[in-house]
Amino acid sequence: MLIEIPNVFSKQEVSHLREQLDARRWIDGNQTSGAMATTRKRNQQLDKDDPVAVALGQQIMDRLLAHPQFVSAALPLQFYPPLFNRYQGGETFGYHIDNAIRSTPDGMIRTDLSATLFLSEPENYQGGELVIQDTYGQQSIKLSAGSLVLYPSSSLHQVTPVLSGERTAAFMWLQSMVRDEGQRRLLFQLDQSIQSLTAQTAAEQELFNLSGVYHNLLRRWSEL
């Protein structure tokens, strides 16, 4: 399941984020690469321990955990703290699958979901599409600044070469309370239907029944 979430951050907020990011020292992006990815990856990143990157990453996590659509789709249990990357001058990251397990200060997490928060407007760079191969075929993603795409970490994906301009983004992984992608999809669809019916002031008893089904499925499928 691939979910696009628009306007997680406003244009003004993105501009403020970029001012802080652009002033930092960027390093070789292979810091977070697995052994097989190093030959395919050419980009720049902020060091994961950079204090500005850490603070902005926390701001992003706080925003996402307060976003109903993100929480509904991801059912987040634990984040790998957001990182920041930049592509320019032909830089690219060829097809790869993200590492299944990552180490955090609090221990190991299983990467169920990957997310990219775009911090450059699409008209400001040529190329740089996030191309994802999933069960529905190939999808090419290039969202407006402040918008986010969420997709299974098991997906084969790439960032195409940035031929002109600059593509800056935040990227992150997370472990979901529900490991199985198909089960997460069903729960998301059910939750979105419940929210839609609630907005339409549907019959109270039916909403209680549907909500009970949702929570009983979540209870059955979740791993904490």
From Swiss-Prot:
Instruction: Tell me the cofactor note.
Output: Binds 1 Fe(2+) ion per subunit.
Q: Where is the Fe2OG dioxygenase domain?
A: 78-176
Tell whether rRNA processing is among the UniProt keywords: no
Recorded hits in InterPro entries, A to Z, give: Oxoglu/Fe-dep_dioxygenase_dom, PKHD_C, PKHD_hydroxylase, Pro_4_hyd_alph, Pro_4_hyd_alph_FE2OG_OXY
What SUPFAM superfamilies does its record include? Answer: Clavaminate synthase-like
Domain of life of the organism in this record? Bacteria
> Pfam families, from UniProt?
2OG-FeII_Oxy_3, PKHD_C
The residues the record assigns to binding Fe cation are H96, D98, H157
E.C. number: 1.14.11.-
The entry's 2-oxoglutarate-binding residues are R167
- Which UniProt key words apply to this protein? Dioxygenase, Iron, Metal-binding, Oxidoreductase, Vitamin C
Q: Which GO terms describe its biological process?
A: DNA damage response; intracellular iron ion homeostasis
User: Which co-factors does it depend on?
Assistant: Fe(2+); L-ascorbate
Coiled-coil region(s): none
Cite the GO molecular-function annotations of the record: 2-oxoglutarate-dependent dioxygenase activity; iron ion binding; L-ascorbic acid binding
Instruction: Report the protein name in the record.
Output: PKHD-type hydroxylase Sbal_3634
The organism named in the record is Shewanella baltica (strain OS155 / ATCC BAA-1091)
